[in-house]
Amino acid sequence: MNQYLAVTSNGMENLLVEELTKLGIENAKPVQAGVKFKATNEQIYRCCLWSRLASRFVRVLSEFTCNDDMDLYLSTSSINWVNQFHSSKRFVVDFNGTNREIRNSQYGAMKVKDGIVDCFEKKGLPRPNISKERPDIRVHVRLHKDKAILGVDMVGSGLHQRGYRPESGRAPLRETLAAAIIMRCGWDGHQPLLDPMCGSGTLLIEAAMMAANMAPGVKRKQWCFESLEDFEPDTWAEIKSEANVQARRGVKKVDAKFFGFDNDPKVLKVAQENARRAGVEELIEFAQGDVATITRLSGFENGVIVSNPPYGERLGTEPGLIALYTAFGGQLKAEFGGCKASIFSSSDELLSCLRMRADKQFKLNNGALPCHQKNYSIAERSADEVKGADTNTQIAPDFSNRLKKNIGKIGKWARKEKLDCYRIYDADLPEYNVAIDVYGDQIVIQEYAAPKNIPEEKAKRRLTDIIRATIQVTGVEANKVVLKVREKQKGRSQYQKLGQVSETLEVNEYGVKLIVNLHDYLDTGLFLDHKITRRRLGEMAQGKDFLNLFAYTGSATVHAAVGGARSTTTVDMSNTYLNWAKDNMQLNGCIGRQHRFEQADCLQWLENAKGEYDLIFIDPPTFSNSKRMETSFDVQRDHIKLMTNLKRLLRAGGTIVFSNNKRHFKMDEEGLAELGLKAQNISSQTLPLDFSRNKHIHNCWLVTHAE
């Protein structure tokens, strides 16, 4: 007998022990991400062919203390490699791990290779060749701290490669993991099995192969143990022949029914082709279907639903996934009473959207991603009970009630004002710390970063509730909900690009048409707290020369132009936003040489600007480090210097509309008086109803000549 290590994923060790025991292995011992045991050649051949859970089997030749490269070389060269494989065989070293002295796995592999070839040379034999592309032998090394395991891989390519799925295909779930999910889902091998989001069909194919008692390795063409010196071809031929016969007979004896649905017809074709290659196509019925509308199938009494729904990690996918899981849970309860369900996901928050209590749960890894598998018993309920439960279940009641109240009040005001864009919630309740804005038929939820004393899991669960409640209260479709995370920004980082969706939306603000982008940037191109300021600028602009500094996307310029400004000058450092401003102007028919756009650092532009203007709007950042200037800008510290330059451009009888977002900003009225200017605080007049709870969102001033 030889010592072996069966390699598997974290969380599958005990399941693998059970499987190996059924295959005739005694005293199998679980270790981290593996199982150790002893076996004869016949037993290991059978394990390689029949294991659904192991990713590979390694014959352990040595376990040793490895402090440095010399320990590694000496331990390797002390093994009698001639007894393992012939010098004509090509080999490769798979080296996993590092320690304080062996810091590079390639270097570790080289030292092992040296030890092997030197062993052959010392016995007067030719050096075996290295081949990374098509090796006959794979030497396996696992190093952790000062402990090393060295052996030969019995398999070759991973055992998850059953041969029915092309490696080029999309495979979010490895076959070994799919088998573990099936083994733990509560299915007895005879009940009908349904995967309503089957994708490429891996879960159903693995289950069908189990029901048919089909060896998972029956389609494999090459095994590394066939190149070992102690290979027993007759024993292997007999084991393989038995498995082939069993595969043919087993398919005909299956009494379970398998159903796979997916809303993507292209993916379904892939699933059908995979099932054909696996030899179980006649057992599985694939059809196009949506998980949100799936109904109980004929003959599905006491069936099992198993699924691996999407659980995307990228910011912005959450609203759609929350709606998907919510709809899935609703359909399970409405249509599949008396059945069982087993759902696999990396997100406990998404699983909570099913609104079902799990009977059992298991922890497994999908690659490096920690995941949960939860098993549910679905209670039998009448249609009226299901409908009543759905109607009466309110998510996050305090938040939902506040949102309803705000929508009633603010929505009515927005319709009267002819506004497409407005805020319906602004962290009204401290525990639900988000801002929610309406943009036409879409909604943007901005999550303010949670305080450090709030546990991450609690913050995630609360955000999930917010999104679900917002969808429920507003009735908006999930694909029209956009999620952003807002943290304290420095300089112009709020303008940095987040993505590349490039999907824009045209909105209306007091009769002015504007373009917003809800996806690609932290901000959307329109600061909603300044809507009344912009309207006022439009009312003041008739027949005047208008200057807009720190113009962003030029929305204030558009209001001024639509209001009848004689000319407009729009200045911003970003060429992206200047082009956006041009598009906004063109959308409203405001084109011509009287409308100028200048890309420049506004502070430096002011130092050298010439000309006079009747109306100037300036909304500078609270603080800025300009690359083109030697010093920083602080609006509290530097606003008098700013006004000094602005006065030079302000025509007699003209007005500066000066705004900023610094809380508790204090205007230096004495400094203004010395310049011959005076200021009137109009902040309360420019605060719209939807921002009435946040009276310090901005401050706004009218600055004019004192005389």
Curated annotation (Swiss-Prot):
It is found in: Cytoplasm. Its EC number is 2.1.1.173, 2.1.1.264. Residues 43-154 form the THUMP domain. The keyword S-adenosyl-L-methionine applies. One of its GO terms (cellular component) is cytoplasm. One of its GO terms (molecular function) is RNA binding. It is an enzyme of class 2 (transferase). Keywords: Cytoplasm, Methyltransferase, RNA-binding, rRNA processing, S-adenosyl-L-methionine, Transferase. It catalyses: guanosine(2445) in 23S rRNA + S-adenosyl-L-methionine = N(2)-methylguanosine(2445) in 23S rRNA + S-adenosyl-L-homocysteine + H(+); guanosine(2069) in 23S rRNA + S-adenosyl-L-methionine = N(2)-methylguanosine(2069) in 23S rRNA + S-adenosyl-L-homocysteine + H(+). Specifically methylates the guanine in position 2445 (m2G2445) and the guanine in position 2069 (m7G2069) of 23S rRNA. Belongs to the methyltransferase superfamily. RlmKL family. PANTHER family: RIBOSOMAL RNA LARGE SUBUNIT METHYLTRANSFERASE K/L, RIBOSOMAL RNA LARGE SUBUNIT METHYLTRANSFERASE K_L. HAMAP family: 23SrRNA_methyltr_KL (MF_01858). NCBIfam families: PRK11783.1. This is Ribosomal RNA large subunit methyltransferase K/L. It comes from Vibrio parahaemolyticus serotype O3:K6 (strain RIMD 2210633). The lineage of its organism: Bacteria, Pseudomonadati, Pseudomonadota, Gammaproteobacteria, Vibrionales.
